[in-house]
Amino acid sequence: MKATLLLLCLACSALAAPPTKKQPEPAKPLPPLEKATIAIDGHPESVAADAEGNIYFTCIGAKLAPTEKDKDGYLGVIPHGSTEPKKITDVDTLDAPKGLLYQDGFLYCTDVDMVYKIDAKTGTIEGYVDLSPSRMKFLNDLAFINGRLMVSSTDTDQIFYVDTNTSSYGELVTKQPIYKPNGLAWDPERKVIYLCEYATDEKGKPSGRLLSINPVSREVTELSKERGQYDGLVYRDNALYYSDWSKDKKPEAIRRLDLKTGRSAPAATGPIEGAADFIPVSYTHLRAHETLRHL
């Protein structure tokens, strides 16, 4: 089975008028998206890029089973200048890889209850961390936070520091609870972690929040009164870009929150289906991918 990988270019233009103190007014939508789709075998989840413009992606597998250890998943690459995806990892290597990062020739990915460090050219596993003793089944996003690799555990409401060189890990215990943590990002100026939640309340209504976490004090701060089922998260130029499954097939599926004004706006003028993860590809652009649109 195939799904499509959607590449989106989002203009990061500044927002205009300042907000009111009590209730920020909605900002104007950003310019239209430029997009192109590429067919992928299976269910793509996250994307990453290197300096040469190669686009890497994780694929959960032919069936959408993100918590099963079925050896059905893989890592792939779309070489720069090509529209033909290629598999990097061998069959029976990965189960359901989700979060993905590229750094210094290596790909870091989450896979159910594992975190792997994989050679981006050969697909060889160069290091790993086994988090199964903590009994999670849904390790999700990754981010380098102040030089340390961190991962979100969506099903256990936790965030972990991991070290693929020593195969060790530890939990970042926050002072206030977090629920269904998903996307992670680091703000090097403010020295805070950004987090979005994929959560619902007892009635099934979207209740996920956009948060900042001080890694030293462990204090959690809400950034917006908006609620959703958030997935991908990127910090860029004093703004957060985030995807929302509760707004699937709408322009609001991807939004931009200006951290200076507190105002948010749709990052698209047309409907977007299945938007999940994002990657920055230049100073003024982002790329995102669309998952679960079957051919």
Give the residues covered by each predicted segment:
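A short beta-strand motif characteristic of beta-propeller blades
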Residues: 33-37, 84-90, 126-131, 168-174, ...
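Beta-strand-rich domains and repeat architectures in extracellular enzymes and scaffolds
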Residues: 37-65, 69-71
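Beta-rich, blade/repeat-based domains predominating
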Residues: 41-52, 91-104, 133-150, 177-192, ...
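Residue position within the beta-strands of beta-propeller blades
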Residues: 56-58, 109, 151, 195, ...
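Short loop/turn segments that connect beta-strands within beta-propeller blades
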Residues: 79-82, 119-123, 163-167, 214-217, ...
